[in-house]
């Protein structure tokens, strides 16, 4: 698949995300892998529902630098980390949904465990509601290098799939292509909403 076609799919996903209100106030960032050395990442400060192909910057996966000199997203280091940690990841979506942001603060543990929901099967490799989907939860940090280091250390100790939550911040998820990343995002967001409602009802 050509870079332009991949970027077109990513722009479509960004507009879909924007229409759902999942990246408010220019928040969030999205990318695709170009090859082993570079990715295309959304430029900082842009409304995600209005992005065009020209709003994506080529970024060096090893150095986090944009050869063009333009400013990539604040969380560039998280995207490049995912591409280094997960060779199968070719698209990354980082969003600020209400469910992900609030649920990440309700979970006091380092992992969110979800089970019993049919929609777990929206995640690649999940075949039954009887399994448990584990989503790591990391404390937010404005020092992205330090945060990336913590995530990398966790991944060495406890390999994980699909995505992770940043406490009080949002969800980062990925897939083998834009379509899979988008499906993982929609599936996880649905599961987070179910988990939120279940926790609310259990308190009544």
Swiss-Prot record:
Pfam families xrefs: Aldolase_II
An annotated Gene Ontology molecular function: zinc ion binding
Coiled coil: none
Cofactor (UniProt): Zn(2+)
Keywords associated with the record: Amino-acid biosynthesis, Lyase, Metal-binding, Methionine biosynthesis, Zinc
EC number: 4.2.1.109
Residue positions binding Zn(2+): 94, 96
Family statement drawn from the similarity comment of this UniProt entry: Belongs to the aldolase class II family. MtnB subfamily.
NCBIfam families in UniProt: PRK09220.1, salvage_mtnB
Listed name of the protein: Methylthioribulose-1-phosphate dehydratase
Organism listed in the record: Enterobacter sp. (strain 638)
């Amino acid at each position: 698949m050509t870079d332009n076609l991949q970027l077109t799919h990513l722009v479509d996903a960004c507009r879909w995300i924007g229409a759902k209100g999942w990246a408010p106030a220019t928040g969030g960032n999205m990318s695709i892998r170009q090859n082993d050395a570079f990715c295309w990442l959304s430029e900082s400060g842009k409304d995600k529902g209005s992005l065009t192909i020209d709003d994506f910057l080529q970024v060096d996966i090893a150095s986090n630098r944009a050869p063009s000199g333009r400013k990539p997203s604040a969380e560039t280091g998280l995207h490049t980390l995912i591409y280094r940690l997960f060779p199968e990841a070719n698209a990354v979506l980082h969003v600020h949904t209400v469910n992900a942001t609030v649920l990440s603060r309700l979970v006091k543990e380092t992992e969110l465990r979800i089970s019993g929901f049919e929609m777990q099967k929206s995640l690649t490799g999940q075949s039954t509601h009887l399994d448990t989907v584990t989503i790591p939860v990391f404390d937010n940090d404005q020092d992205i290098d330090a945060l990336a280091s913590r995530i990398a250390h966790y991944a060495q100790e406890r390999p994980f799939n699909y995505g992770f939550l940043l406490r009080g911040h949002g969800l980062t998820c990925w897939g083998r292509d834009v379509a899979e990343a988008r499906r993982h995002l929609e599936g996880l967001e649905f599961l987070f909403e179910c988990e939120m409602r279940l926790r609310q009802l259990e308190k009544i």
